[in-house]
Amino acid sequence: MAALKLLSSGLRLGASARSSRGALHKGCVCYFSVSTRHHTKFYTDPVEAVKDIPNGATLLVGGFGLCGIPENLIGALLKTGVKDLTAVSNNAGVDNFGLGLLLRSKQIKRMISSYVGENAEFERQFLSGELEVELTPQGTLAERIRAGGAGVPAFYTSTGYGTLVQEGGSPIKYNKDGSVAIASKPREVREFNGQHFILEEAITGDFALVKAWKADRAGNVIFRKSARNFNLPMCKAAGTTVVEVEEIVDIGSFAPEDIHIPKIYVHRLIKGEKYEKRIERLSLRKEGDGKGKSGKPGGDVRERIIKRAALEFEDGMYANLGIGIPLLASNFISPNMTVHLQSENGVLGLGPYPLKDEADADLINAGKETVTVLPGASFFSSDESFAMIRGGHVNLTMLGAMQVSKYGDLANWMIPGKMVKGMGGAMDLVSSSKTKVVVTMEHSAKGNAHKIMEKCTLPLTGKQCVNRIITEKGVFDVDKKNGLTLIELWEGLTVDDIKKSTGCDFAVSPNLMPMQQIST
């Protein structure tokens, strides 16, 4: 009772001191603030919630693919007709949904994103000079937003060193004739403990448009499954944060320790009128199929690579797998082995594809495919995910490539002026020296063009980052100083065959063995 009286007294004292703007009484150590300066404002009409967004504003727009996007708020912007927007978002949805709608209506002037993906209109506008696009590594984008919300003006990261991100010159805007009108600027470089890092500046927005699952009437917010992604850091990095939710509950419905975003970051709240929650890539398994498939292996060549790649897994390992061959290799993980699969959109403990009635729009992998999770799995935000990746907590990264150099340089994200998919999370995934990087790819491109080369001719994803190359013809180990060593060779091929199809010289291991295949 004495403690309650003291608390009550402190509250009165705090209120009195604040209202009079005077000093606290001598001898008082602290007081409880009861300021009413900021309250979350609730809306019923999404247009009302965004109508004051002016032309030329910078918007932070949450979501990953179509998962966790603020559908109702994007629809409201279509109605207000606001123009010349700078949209900061991991990607731009698809042609006819998500931010793709604002691209089609020509309301966006510049995108700051990591991935163009399958949005053909996004790519068309960029390559034709209609849209400015600042492509940024996914983890760097997440950290720039996190830093902006935390009041950190800039930070150093190893991601992007030795690439166009560091060197500058990456096209931001094309002229109609295909020449570069605006190019990215070089980054400052510093060395710490013998490793190179580049300086990245924080990102803040005028407004953040965020999708969450539930909010209470105080303004506290929680997310659902992998729909957390970029939504969480964006909540904290804007002058005005507008959150749309599926349900609003009474104060006290959430345990304090379960709240993902405290009310201090939330300025406006609205319950979305309706949600389509479209699934970009519905991937399913059938009853009795323990893993499920993301497409077919694609014949002997791909299956050969997949079955060799599966031997890279070790019990207890944390691994991040790219779409295509790397992800298909996970189908061959032994049931006697535990491999923890991490997905950069915020999942640790990926399981098989869902049955038809298990598919969930709020649970996808980095390839935007529907997935399930295993017991012991966890969900987290994009900035947290890339802290795991950049910090070297992931043991293995397996991904595809367009080109790999003799000394382990990797190129897999763009063909200037022709094809721009964006680097996504790849630059971050290969940035940690603590993580083993394995490239899986066909040995040659169309027309038997070399993919393993003396020097990459395409823009780099990472410099001297690849540790091993697996193709249908053999396996190479990569040394940053000494180059390639052929350690495994497919049955029926000779070393001379490999020399003819490889665009650089390589050593041959004295212990050269037949190319291994996992038993099935």
Swiss-Prot record:
The modification N6-succinyllysine is found at residues 185, 418, 421, 455. PROSITE patterns: COA_TRANSF_1, COA_TRANSF_2. InterPro entries: 3-oxoacid_CoA-transf_A, 3-oxoacid_CoA-transf_B, 3-oxoacid_CoA-transferase, CoA_trans_fam_I, CoA_transf_AS, CoA_transf_BS, NagB/RpiA_transferase-like. It comes from the Eukaryota. The modification Phosphoserine is found at residue 170. Its EC number is 2.8.3.5. Its main location: mitochondrion. One of its GO terms (biological process) is response to hormone. It is found in: Mitochondrion. One of its GO terms (cellular component) is mitochondrion. Pathway: Ketone metabolism; succinyl-CoA degradation; acetoacetyl-CoA from succinyl-CoA: step 1/1. Signal peptide: none annotated. Residues 1-39 form a transit peptide. The active site is at residue 344. SUPFAM superfamilies: NagB/RpiA/CoA transferase-like. Keywords: Lipid metabolism, Mitochondrion, Phosphoprotein, Transferase, Transit peptide. GO terms for molecular function: identical protein binding; succinyl-CoA:3-oxo-acid CoA-transferase activity. It catalyses: a 3-oxo acid + succinyl-CoA = a 3-oxoacyl-CoA + succinate; acetoacetate + succinyl-CoA = acetoacetyl-CoA + succinate. Homodimer. Only one subunit is competent to transfer the CoA moiety to the acceptor carboxylate (3-oxo acid). Key enzyme for ketone body catabolism. Catalyzes the first, rate-limiting step of ketone body utilization in extrahepatic tissues, by transferring coenzyme A (CoA) from a donor thiolester species (succinyl-CoA) to an acceptor carboxylate (acetoacetate), and produces acetoacetyl-CoA. Acetoacetyl-CoA is further metabolized by acetoacetyl-CoA thiolase into two acetyl-CoA molecules which enter the citric acid cycle for energy production. Belongs to the 3-oxoacid CoA-transferase family. This is Succinyl-CoA:3-ketoacid coenzyme A transferase 1, mitochondrial.
